[in-house]
Each structure stands twice: as structure tokens, then as C-alpha cells.
Amino acid sequence: SKKFGAKAKRAVFKPNCRLMFGLKNKNYFSSSMDSSDGLSTTLNEMSSQSKKRFVITRMPSENDVFEFAASNKLNSNDLILNGGEEYEIVATTSKANLPKIKKDAKKHRIKLYEIGYVTKGTGVFYKRKGKLIRMKDKGWQHLQP
């Protein structure tokens, strides 16, 4: 759709940095990174650094992404996970701190996506229909031959 195309271009060419939101909530985050290299890259890096398993139960997206993917014969998960360039904050937090972050996000009209949970183990997995599917790092790779 044209609406999605305009939104996607704006995210790349005029990213909306959520610096103040990140700074205000930094004490509530147990870890955080930006998603500029793609969500799959960010989640795999966070998993590697924390030595924890990340289980994704919900793709962070609006219906327009799915509609765009379907109308252009693209895989919506590839668009969501491997695109990058949007500079959104990806963070982990405790259940106790989540309401505080949600309240601040609502106050500043920032849409939050709860996409999964962190547990013992390693790697990043997408939980679909009860099965865990490993999510590979397919985002932007710097200085690769």
C-alpha cells in the first residue's frame, strides 16, 4: 500500500530516534540495543552477550506490513526481522518494571511491542504452533567479505 511505502521510507530516511524514552527508562531495562542492523541481528547479539535464550512469540508489526508482503509476494517475517534501518529500541525488562515502561510509552505516544521472553539457554527462537524455530542472524553484517 502507498501508506506503508511512505511509512517505510520515513523510517529509513528520517528515523525517529527514541533517545529520551531510552534515557528515561534505562534503569528499567535489563538490556537494550537498537535495531538498525535488523531485528534478527539485534536479538542474536543480545542473546550472545547475555548467554540467554530469546523466545519470540509475536512478530512486532502492523497489518500493513503483512498486506505489503502479500501483495508483493514477499515473506513478511523476512521484512520484519532482517530489514533494519529503523533505529528502534529493543530491550528486555522484568515483569515488575514493564508497567512503568508501558506508562511512559503511552504518555509519549510510543507503541511498544511485547514480542517474547528470555529464558535459560542460548540462541533466538520463534515459537510457532508450539514448536521452536531457530531464528538466524540475517540482518546487516558489517565488514563481511
Predicted regions and their residues:
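Helix-biased detector of long, well-ordered alpha-helical tracts
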Residues: 1-145
